[in-house]
Amino acid sequence: MARIGYARTFTTDQNLAAQIAALRNAGCEVIREEQKSGASLEGRPQLMTILDFIHAGETFVITRIDRLARSLRDLQVIVDRLKAKGAHLVATEQPADTSTAAGKAFFDMLGVFAGFETNLRRERQAEGIAAARKRGIYKGRPPKIDRAEILLRLQQGQGPSKIARDLGISRGTVYQVRKGVFE
């Protein structure tokens, strides 16, 4: 089956040659290159092309995991997409190969740690919000609706659909304000 390589550097100043050579040595027939930040999956069209078109039994080859993803969450998203398609992931410089039992276990553990990281972040955020509320600093997100503006427009005879369209809210919200739900 096909082996598809992916080489990425953060900037155009960095050289992809070493990664490309390693991917060729790993038997990659196709190599996609990207010189962009790894901060966002969506901002990496070559990676998205590979994930969209890889087939069952094919292997996605990288040199190191940090070339693929900057966060456990993003890595888990990529691994899940590959798994759903029946494709494998191999890192040439690290013991990561999802076609083996050990490699599968490695990525399953990464998934556990990604969930743990998310839960820790939520806990820290909740603690920070609670502390800010105690100090009177945190007010939450400002409300999207301007109750007074809606009521004024209703009094002027505007219809709920026009008000909703103009203010970027749902018609239901206009009806709720009219009924007094948003006091």
Curated annotation (Swiss-Prot):
InterPro entries: Homeodomain-like_sf, Recombinase_CS, Resolv_N, Resolvase-like_N_sf, Resolvase_HTH_dom, SSR_resolvase. The keyword Transmembrane helix does not apply. The lineage of its organism: Bacteria, Pseudomonadati, Pseudomonadota, Alphaproteobacteria, Hyphomicrobiales. Coiled coil: none annotated. It comes from Sinorhizobium fredii (strain NBRC 101917 / NGR234). The keyword S-adenosyl-L-methionine does not apply. The record marks F10 as: Ancestral active site Ser. PANTHER family: DNA-INVERTASE FROM LAMBDOID PROPHAGE, RESOLVASE HOMOLOG YNEB. This is Integrase-like protein y4lS. One of its GO terms (molecular function) is DNA strand exchange activity. GO terms for biological process: DNA integration; transposition. SMART domains: Resolvase. Keywords: DNA integration, DNA invertase, DNA recombination, DNA-binding, Plasmid, Transposable element, Transposition. Signal peptide: none annotated.
